[in-house]
UniProtKB/Swiss-Prot annotation:
Protein's gene: glyQ
Places the protein is found: Cytoplasm
Domain of life: Bacteria
InterPro entries assigned: aa-tRNA-synth_II/BPL/LPL, Gly-tRNA-synth_heterodimer, Gly-tRNA_ligase_asu
Record key words, sorted: Aminoacyl-tRNA synthetase, ATP-binding, Cytoplasm, Ligase, Nucleotide-binding, Protein biosynthesis
Protein name per the record: Glycine--tRNA ligase alpha subunit
Organism of origin: Streptococcus pneumoniae (strain CGSP14)
Enzyme Commission number, as recorded: 6.1.1.14
Length: 305
């Protein structure tokens, strides 16, 4: 019987595969976020006309999902392997199935289903056509073709493939609890993450200072606006991410009512939309440097008319 891939070998295998498909291997972005989609390597690069192909691991924090390390599948923080390709290759689904084969999962021997599940992120004004990918009855991946990001229509279309690494590793290693996943030879997932899971859950549900978080949200929102007034897209987006994580902490703590919740989401969305518009304008001002010469000249000429 062949040795099962460790968690880090799964990551390395996916990195090698998508590198061979022309993706840049980016590193995780250093701000808290609820999903890999919120990284600027996806959110910002999915808009505008320039091509973009990237793959990266993104630790994703969802305070309300914390379970003190007691639930085998529900986590405060999990890991996503994110692939974004713009324009979307026509064979992206075939490439995805090929990536599973590299992980030792033969599509001909397993029940792999693409289940329609259109995607929406209200807090960033983003949406797209999507599918969940189910492997023998368990969701392991989300497929999305972005239609709108930051309130802007996308073009060319960006394809996003988001692997749930813990679920994928649980399946490959045949374990029932994420904490039993072998991260590296001789080191289990739980030995690294179960204590942080407990502590972050306790903080999110019991200890966090609600007044401080409320004040921080207002301060982060204001600072994002100040950065945008100066045309500073990336610092502004950092503060949008801080607003989002602060809201998630408030939500986990039960500190916002249903009505207030909608208001906070709208405030984050409004900032994200301004960031998106400012980013597109910035790339145009820079002359769309990632476009080939012919396409760039044509597009800039059209914009000048």
């Amino acid at each position: 019987m062949s040795k099962k891939l460790t968690f880090q070998e799964i990551i390395l295998t996916l990195q090698r595969f998508w590198n061979d498909q022309g993706c840049m291997l980016m590193q995780a972005y250093d701000n808290e976020k609820g999903a890999g989609t919120m990284s600027p390597y996806t959110f910002l690069r999915a808009i505008g006309p320039e091509p973009w192909n990237a793959a990266y691991v993104e630790p994703s924090r969802r305070p309300a999902d914390g379970r003190y390390g007691e639930n085998p599948n529900r986590l405060y923080q999990h890991h996503q392997f994110q692939v974004v390709m713009k324009p979307s290759p026509s064979n992206i689904q075939e490439l995805y199935l090929e990536s599973l084969e590299k992980l030792g999962i033969n599509p001909l021997e397993h029940d792999i289903r693409f289940v329609e599940d259109n995607w929406e992120n209200p807090s960033t004004g983003s949406a797209g056509l999507g599918w969940e990918v189910w492997l023998d009855g368990m969701e392991i991946t989300q497929f999305t073709y972005f239609q709108q990001v930051g309130g802007l229509a996308t073009g060319p279309v960006t394809a996003e493939v988001t692997y749930g690494l813990e679920r994928l590793a649980s399946y490959i290693q045949e374990v029932d609890s994420v904490y039993d996943i072998e991260w590296a030879d001789g080191v289990k997932y739980g030995e690294i993450f179960i204590q942080p899971e407990y502590e972050h859950s306790k903080y999110s549900f019991e200890i966090s200072d609600q007044e401080m978080l409320l004040e921080n949200f207002d301060k982060f929102e204001k600072e994002a606006g100040r950065a945008l007034e100066e045309g500073l897209v990336h610092p502004a987006y950092d503060y949008v991410l801080k607003c989002s994580h602060t809201f998630n902490l408030l939500d986990a703590r039960g500190a916002v009512s249903v009505t207030e919740r909608a208001g906070y989401i709208a405030r984050i969305r409004n900032l994200a939309r301004v960031v998106a518009k400012t980013f597109v304008a910035e790339r145009k001002r820079l002359g769309y440097p990632l476009l080939d010469e012919e396409t760039r000249a044509k597009l800039l000429a059209e914009d000048a008319e």
